[in-house]
Amino acid sequence: MEFFAWLDQLDKNIFTAIQEQLGVEWLDSAMLLLRNATTWIPLYLFVLIWIFKNASPHAVSFIVLTIITFAFCDFVSASVLKPLVGRLRPCYDTDVASSVRGLIGCGGRFSFPSSHAANHFGLATFWFLAIRHVIGK
């Protein structure tokens, strides 16, 4: 079996095992909360307020660069990597669709990489580097 076919089958086996044997209701609720964009508003507001308070001459640049970082990460993950990798979301993959515990709608056709993860990782990296520069460490 070719490596990528083996990896695809392993991915499907792990997904099916998690969906059918390891589903936990309280964890479902926690994950739904964490994936909700409004959950993160307090963090974003805190960072913005902190920047205006501690780095006011650079605050506008910080906000503009934050928006650029978000847009870049979202574009690369959704428009470049997802079509390039072509990993179907489980709800569209006939091999595992019957195992999907549909807690939310299905979304776009492809699922890898996660745009949520790419966007948050991009923001976290930019903020870490920028804030470190602002506080001089």
Segments predicted by a language model, with ranges:
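Interfacial segments of alpha-helical transmembrane regions
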Residues: 48-77
